[in-house]
Amino acid sequence: QQSDIAEIVVPRSPDSHKGSHGTIAIVTGSSQMAGAALMAAHGAVRSGAGKVFLRVPGKVGPYCIGVQPEVMVKSVGTGDCFTADDAESIIAESNHWSVLAMGPGMGRDDGTRDFLKRVLEQVTCPVVLDADALNLLAGEKEFLSAIGHRLIVTPHLAEFSRLSGFSLDEIKDDLIGRARAFAADWKVNLVLKGAPTLIVSAKTGNVYVNPTGNAGMACGGMGDILTGMIAAMTAHQGMSDLCSAACAGVYLHGAAGDACRKDRGPYGFTPMETADAVPSVLADLEKNLALPILQQPLIGGK
């Protein structure tokens, strides 16, 4: 509920700066799906990230540079998709990042799988994994569980089936049970996207059911926006843990979609428009919070 999210998305300190609100790295994309990378970056920007870096394969860079001036884009390597040879430059940069997001539009090339695993083995920051990152790591239980404490994985039902090995029927027959079992077994924080979306804590096994969102959000790209939003929430000043960040990102994403539905109706609003609604949703959330003493207005000059 909104009151739960208000407790974990704390107001910005008046003396904060861009470094206080996290350095988000979106490392993803391929020549056929540059838009997915751009949408993930946009989701992070609109959710209040202090700085957003976008790292894309060499041939993708020209399609991304300058599209959103707030996003700092750099090409990595020379190909249409990431390869194992590209991993070292990402690993070297990762020491400066608060959180890393990977997967949207990444493609399923074998070289990209090698790249992904090399990066995940070496980085130490929290990581949000979505889309093709999950498809590439399907069945890699031993690998993922070894680093699961710093992961948030965000599959929809089909991706969850490929990743976990559960059939779609098994998942639908016991959604909460399968989600909880997976998070415990694989030792990851899980966002199982659907209607409703479930969030499961790797630490406690607690399951949270998101109340926001609507059928107008059932279109390509919404998950990419969510990836960026969860990454931004992970780096939000005062955020206590990865599961809380996932809950906040999912709730705000759905609430932004609900705002779009209210303004435009249930048809045709876009993922980018949904991201653009997030600042207003956050502003509404903040109105219901007590202001810290430094942000309270002075009355009578005292």
Segments predicted by a language model, with ranges:
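Small-residue (G/A/S/T)-rich helix-start motifs and N-terminal tracts that mark the onset
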Residues: Q1-V127, N135-I152, L157-K302
